[in-house]
Swiss-Prot record:
It comes from Streptococcus thermophilus (strain ATCC BAA-250 / LMG 18311). GO terms for cellular component: cytoplasm. This is Argininosuccinate synthase. Pfam families: Arginosuc_syn_C, Arginosuc_synth. Pathway: Amino-acid biosynthesis; L-arginine biosynthesis; L-arginine from L-ornithine and carbamoyl phosphate: step 2/3.
Length: 399
């Protein structure tokens, strides 16, 4: 009797390698690894999955799709969870879940497995996404079921011939993609401990960053960054290039105690050099091109979208509707932002746009001023009329 097939989200690490051995007793395991911009050795991971016991192994480079369909909407929405975290890991989980479901359909698998623990956000993100895409698929979470200590897991691995990585004594848990790098555990679990330099991987410290500022011109077309210093490139490549440039200058270090979806607080160290530089540049072009009412209303939806994405609801009608609104606002977001990178800071120091609503003749205080100041008298009277009437009725001046 043939076994059911299970699709395993495979990283090549100890947890998911042990999961193959554990799952293959009851399933034919099909391992799937995706590169969302962390620079994995896909060939090595492909072969390792087969060596450990998978019957098939898929490796997928999804950087371009991730950048265009997931990162770009978040960039255009200035998506920060709790006004601080640019949703690094939260953005990659929906595309990973989507690809797992696609391969399940392709191979006839009935079940999807992931390597998340029972106290993190990612278990929720994967399982809610899978249920949204195909509720008939079953989900198993070996690591959550084991509840093993690290020592017990290593003992099981050795007993079953699973290679134990040489860097297993690394105290940190790291997740990385195009949009940044997330780090937790070890000394970071005490929020009073300053994060040591060894906890950072893609940014220089501001103290060791170059003593000379660097300027980067970011070109936007309909809200999408399309060129750095005039050189056009694919979005995924542009983000990676900005990661290198801004990371060199110490941009994008974030130390955050956040409220997890599962109800606990967690101290996280994020490095998002490209994200912070591009988010900063994009906001400045919006400030130049969007009318006041859109500029004031859009942040309300941005905050709601950030919460939806963080809280595992990418495949929600609410998320789809907000992204559609955001996309509509981007038609006029064209131009160039000049970003100054220096000692941990990304600052826009100049900007221009063919869609600019900034009129120098209206704004100037020189003799070139074309603003009709006499019109201000009637405007002020009408603008303040409701407040004036309320005061006269409810708070008459007491002589």
């Amino acid at each position: 009797m043939s076994k059911e097939k299970v699709i395993l989200a495979y990283s090549g690490g100890l947890d998911t390698s042990v999961a193959i051995t554990w799952l293959k007793k009851d399933y034919d395991v099909i391992a799937v690894c995706m590169d969302v911009g962390e620079g994995k050795d896909l060939e090595f991971i492909h072969d390792k999955a087969l060596t450990v016991g998978a019957v098939e192994s898929y490796v997928l480079d999804v950087k371009d799709e991730f950048a265009e369909d997931y990162v770009l909407p978040a960039l255009q929405a200035h998506a920060y969870y709790e006004q601080k975290y640019p949703l690094v890991s939260a953005l990659s989980r929906p595309i990973i879940a989507k690809k797992l479901v696609e391969i399940a359909h392709k191979t006839g698998a009935t079940t999807i497995a992931h390597g998340c623990t029972g106290k993190g956000n990612d278990q929720v993100r994967f399982e809610v996404a899978i249920a949204a895409l195909d509720p008939s698929l079953k989900v198993v979470a070996p690591v959550r079921e084991w509840k093993w200590s690290r020592e017990e897991e290593i003992e099981y691995a050795k007993a079953n011939g699973v290679p134990v990585p040489a860097d297993l004594d690394n105290p940190y848990s790291v997740d990385q993609n195009l949009w940044g790098r997330a780090n937790e555990c070890g000394v970071l679990e005490n929020p009073w401990n300053q994060a040591p330099e060894e906890a950072f991987g893609i940014t220089n410290s501001p103290e060791s960053a170059p003593d000379e500022a660097e300027y980067v011109d970011v070109t936007f077309k309909e809200g999408k960054p399309v060129a750095l210093n005039g050189k056009e490139m694919k979005l995924a490549d542009l983000i990676q290039e900005m990661n290198v440039i801004a990371g060199k200058h110490g941009v994008g270090r974030i130390d955050h105690v956040e409220n997890r979806l599962v109800g606990i607080k967690s101290r996280e160290i994020y490095e998002c050099p490209g994200a912070i530089a591009l988010l900063t540049a994009h906001k400045e072009i919006e400030d130049l091109t969007l009318v006041r009412e859109v500029s004031h209303f859009k942040p309300i939806l941005e905050n709601e979208l950030s919460n939806l994405i963080y809280n595992a609801l990418w495949f929600s009608p609410a998320t789809e509707a907000i992204i559609a609104y955001i996309k509509e606002t981007q038609k006029v977001v064209n131009g160039i932002a000049k970003v100054k990178l220096y000692k941990g800071h990304a600052q826009v120091v100049a900007r221009q746009s063919a869609n600019s609503l900034y009129d120098e003749n209206l704004a100037t205080y020189t003799s070139a001023d074309s603003f009709d100041q006499d019109a201000a008298i009637g405007f002020i009277k009408l603008w303040g009329l409701p407040t004036q009437v309320n005061s006269q009725v409810n708070h008459p001046f007491d002589k």
